[in-house]
Each structure stands twice: as C-alpha cells, then as structure tokens.
C-alpha cells in the first residue's frame, strides 16, 4: 500500500504497531513507530530510504506492487541505521547495480551492516544536487551527529519537500500519515519524548544546522520524516520547537526520582515534594519510582525541568543499581542549564548519597545541598525533608516567590487542629509505620487533615501492605 504525499511522491513505508523497544531496550516505543520510505516518480525514479530489516521481504514485495524494481534509477540513503536502511540487502539482491547516494560515513555504516562493498555507492556532500527530470532536483545537506555521523537530509525542489531523516520525527504509529490528521496531544508528547531521549546530546548542533538549512532560502511546504507523521500543516512549527528545545530548555518544573529498599527513601521524596509545593505553589513537581516507571518518561521530565532531586537507598555502600544506570544515561544525554540535589536513606553505613552527588556533578548538573536520613525517617526527619524541599524551592525559583503569610497561618491552624481535632496518630503493629492525621497519606489519596476514623477501609500500610486492622493508637498518645 502506498499513500500520496504530494504530486509524484508516495509513502511506501511500514507501520509497526507492535514494537515496544528501540535501540535495544533503551527507548520504549509505547505508541509503536513507523519506518518511512518515499518513492519519487519523475523522469527518474528515486527511492528515499527503506524500512527496518525485519520487514525487508514485505517492503520489497509492496514496492514491487508500486513499480517495476528495475525502473528505480536511484536510491538515496539519508541514514544507515537498520531501521532506515535495513531492507537494502533484500532490495539490492533484485537490482544490484542501482546507484546508492549517501554520505561517505554512510558507506562505512552500510558496509558494516550489510557487507556489500561492491554496491554502486555515490558520495554526496552538502550542496550537491541530482537532477531527476521535469525540472526538479534533489539537494543534499549533511547533518553529522543528528544523530549519527552518516546522517543527511534531502530536499526536493519544485515540490518543496524536505526529507528530514530522524530530525523532526517521533516514534508514533497512526493509520493517518499527516500531522493535521492525528491526535495533537499525543503527537507533541511523542515529539518531545523523541527529542529528549535521542537528540538532546546534540542540542548544540541543532541550531547551527537549522540555521544553515534556512540559509539556503528554500521554501518548505512539507517535512517528510523517517518516523511518525509527515508535517504538511504549518511544517515550520516543529522547526521552531526544535530551536526552542535546543536552547538550554527548561520549564518551571522539578522532577524527583528515586529507588528504595524499604520505602524510607520514598518517604523522604514525598516530604521533599510537600516542602517544595508549600513554598512555591507555581512549580510543577513530579515524583517517579524508577523501579516502577517508564525510564523515558522520567528522562523527558528531566529534560523539561529546571532541576532534579535524585534519591537512593544505600546498598553495599553504593547507590541502587537502577539509579546508577539512569544517572549514567543522563550523563550521556548531556542535559544543560539544570540543577540537582541528591538524597537518600541508609542503615549502619552510608556512602550512596555522596557518590550520587559526585555522579550528578560529573553529569553536568549544578549541585545543591544533599540530604541524608538514617533508617526510617521519623517525624523530625520528615520535617527536615520538608524544610529541604522549601529551601530547594527558594534556591531554584525562576521568579520572586509570592509574598504571603497564608502558608504560615495554615500551618499554625493545622498544627492546632492536629492535637485538638484530628485524633491520635496510629501505628502499624507489624512494621511500626505511623499514620499522622495531619499529614495523611498522599500516595493513597488520603488528604492531610484526615482523622483515622475517616481513612477508607481499603487503606494499606505503605510499609508492609497490611490493612487498617493491624493499626493501634500510638502508645505515647493513648489515653
């Protein structure tokens, strides 16, 4: 099946609804992906890219339904990665002498994957052109390290279509091809996820390369990407977003992520978040347990944030493995213009938080004070966590904080209500976790100020997951 992109340009790619892992298991493609290949039929017939190698046979068969393979005059490979050029071996077995136009670096990559140095390679550089008849040309633009050394874009004159390779794409599968036909919220979420997780390390190259392309003064009516939608409605909107994202991007947002062995570090994360929100209600705060969350969603939130707080328990004097792995990945992504703070709990010996602070600094984050707690944090320790959050909110504020005494008044009233109206704290008889009515249990939607009698019957202890029936009134408060 083919789809008309514009005039004599047809999409002949492959949708992949089922793919859930990309680049090994490093990128979760929760909404599938597509491998976009384009057939241009002018006086000369040109195929731009192929599809992922696992669809090689289907691709060649479908292409054969569109055109006699012997009538393909040129093959353009914008990128040699296997999700772009994976079907080359299957295709070239049918038309082995067809010229392949690509960068010099692409020849090395293609031969490294396909092992056919005898293919008819033709090296192109920025500004080189290829006449395809009917007054039209292909213009080639090298884009090294966006995101491989071999990468390039191809522009078709006359139709004013930019075949942009990985740039401006997204791992997003939909039966509709064009950007104005799909769910806009989904689309732009996937665009940002794609940029944050794949292109962020190369942000310093994005702006000059876009500027170079714009310097050709060529009209762009469409941007035909290698993955996801074709931008036909206001195609420059995604270009403008890339320029914004490449410029040390941040929002008024803080991301907290952690791993924990006994929920102690989780308790710290919750209290820190409470302190941040109490001091700066304008800032968006998101908390993730790395063991239970989509890693790429965490990294996308880090990309959006002005700062991150990373928490870990201490295990064998070092940080938890999932935290170590995620920090290593952040190092590779080379985030800029972001602050960080490390926190965590430990038992008889620490070490993880200091190690984590060093790793975050090495990753390029501007470091703020770290925070440690021994064993399970008690009420005093949790208050220190909240105060840490308040201080973070003050230090990281992008604008002057609101001058208000509301929080102070509310805090005084809540404190009075805790002792006068909310009843005693309750302690789990199994693990000793304490429910404080003044603080509630946000992870189970129990709001601060909820007395034990109003806590839902399906409440479970956050530590041992047992029900309300194992709780007793805290001994020190029993009458």
From Swiss-Prot:
Keyword Mitochondrion: no
Major localization listed first in the record, in broad terms: cytoplasm
Bound cofactor: record note: Binds 3 Fe cations per monomer.
UniProt-annotated binding residues for Fe cation 2: 83, 166, 227
A Pfam short name: ODP
Keyword Acetylation: no
Gene3D superfamilies reported in the protein's UniProt record: 2.20.28.10, 3.40.50.360, Ribonuclease Z/Hydroxyacylglutathione hydrolase-like (3.60.15.10)
Binding site for Fe cation 1: 79, 81, 147, 166
Pathway where it operates: Nitrogen metabolism; nitric oxide reduction
Rubredoxin-like domain location: 423-474
Record-level GO cellular component terms: cytoplasm
InterPro entries per UniProt: Anaer_NO_rdtase_flvorubredoxin, Flavodoxin/NO_synth, Flavoprotein-like_sf, Metallo-B-lactamas, ODP_dom, RibonucZ/Hydroxyglut_hydro, Rubredoxin-like_dom, Rubredoxin-O_OxRdtase
Segments forming a coiled coil: none
Span list, region Zinc metallo-hydrolase: 30-210
Binding site for FMN: 260-264, 342-369
Binding-site residues for Fe cation 3, renumbered to this chain: 428, 431, 461, 464
Obligatory cofactor(s): Fe cation; FMN
SMART domains: Lactamase_B (SM00849)
Cellular location(s): Cytoplasm
Domain Flavodoxin-like residue range list: 254-393
Keywords of the record: Cytoplasm, Electron transport, Flavoprotein, FMN, Iron, Metal-binding, Oxidoreductase, Transport
Similarity remark: In the N-terminal section; belongs to the zinc metallo-hydrolase group 3 family.
PANTHER family per record: ANAEROBIC NITRIC OXIDE REDUCTASE FLAVORUBREDOXIN
Record NCBIfam families: PRK05452.1
UniProt function note: Anaerobic nitric oxide reductase; uses NADH to detoxify nitric oxide (NO), protecting several 4Fe-4S NO-sensitive enzymes. Has at least 2 reductase partners, only one of which (NorW, flavorubredoxin reductase) has been identified. NO probably binds to the di-iron center; electrons enter from the NorW at rubredoxin and are transferred sequentially to the FMN center and the di-iron center. Also able to function as an aerobic oxygen reductase.
Protein name: Anaerobic nitric oxide reductase flavorubredoxin
Species this protein is from: Escherichia coli O6:H1 (strain CFT073 / ATCC 700928 / UPEC)
Gene that this sequence comes from: norV
């Amino acid at each position: 099946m083919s789809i008309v992109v514009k005039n004599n340009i047809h999409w002949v790619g492959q949708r992949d609804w089922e793919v859930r892992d990309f680049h090994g298991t490093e990128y979760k493609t929760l909404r599938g992906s597509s491998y976009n290949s384009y057939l241009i039929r002018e006086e000369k017939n040109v195929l731009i890219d192929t599809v992922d190698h696992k669809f090689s046979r289907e691709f060649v068969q479908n292409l054969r339904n569109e055109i006699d393979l012997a009538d393909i005059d040129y093959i353009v490979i914008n990128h040699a990665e296997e999700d772009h050029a994976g079907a080359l071996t299957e295709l070239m077995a049918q038309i082995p002498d067809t010229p392949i136009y690509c960068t010099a670096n692409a020849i090395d990559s293609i031969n490294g994957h396909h092992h056919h140095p005898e293919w008819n390679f033709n090296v192109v550089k920025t500004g080189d052109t290829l006449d395809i008849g009917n007054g039209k040309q292909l213009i080639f633009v090298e884009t090294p390290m966006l995101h491989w050394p071999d990468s390039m874009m191809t522009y078709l004159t006359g139709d004013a279509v930019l075949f942009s390779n990985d740039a401006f794409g997204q791992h997003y599968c939909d039966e509709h091809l064009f950007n104005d036909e799909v769910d806009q919220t989904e689309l732009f979420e996937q665009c940002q996820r794609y940029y944050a997780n794949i292109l962020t390390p190369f942000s310093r190259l994005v702006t000059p390369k876009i500027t170079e392309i714009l310097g050709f003064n060529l009209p762009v009516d469409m941007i035909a990407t290698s993955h996801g939608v074709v931008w036909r409605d206001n195609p420059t909107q995604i270009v403008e977003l890339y320029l914004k994202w490449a410029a040390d991007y941040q929002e008024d947002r803080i991301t907290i992520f952690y791993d924990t062995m006994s929920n102690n570090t989780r308790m710290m994360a919750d209290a820190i978040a409470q302190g941040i929100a109490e001091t700066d209600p304008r800032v968006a705060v998101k908390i993730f347990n790395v063991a239970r969350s989509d890693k790429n969603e965490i990294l996308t939130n880090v990309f959006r944030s002005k700062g991150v707080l990373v928490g870990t328990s201490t295990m064998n004097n070092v940080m938890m493995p999932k935290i170590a792995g995620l920090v290593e990945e952040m190092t590779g992504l080379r985030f800029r213009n972001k602050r960080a703070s490390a926190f965590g709990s430990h038992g008889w010996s620490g070490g993880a938080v200091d190690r984590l602070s060093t790793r975050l600094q090495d990753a390029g984050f501007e470091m703020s004070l770290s925070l440690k707690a021994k064993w399970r944090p008690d009420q005093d320790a949790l208050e220190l966590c909240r105060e840490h959050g308040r201080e973070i909110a003050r230090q990281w504020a992008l604008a002057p904080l609101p001058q208000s005494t509301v929080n102070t008044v509310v805090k005084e009233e809540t404190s009075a209500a805790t002792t006068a109206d909310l009843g005693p704290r309750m302690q789990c008889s199994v693990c000793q976790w304490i429910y404080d009515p003044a603080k509630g249990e946000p992870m189970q939607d129990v709001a601060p100020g909820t007395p034990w009698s109003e806590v839902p019957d399906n409440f479970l202890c956050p530590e041992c997951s047992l029900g309300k029936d194992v709780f007793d009134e805290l001994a020190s408060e029993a009458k």
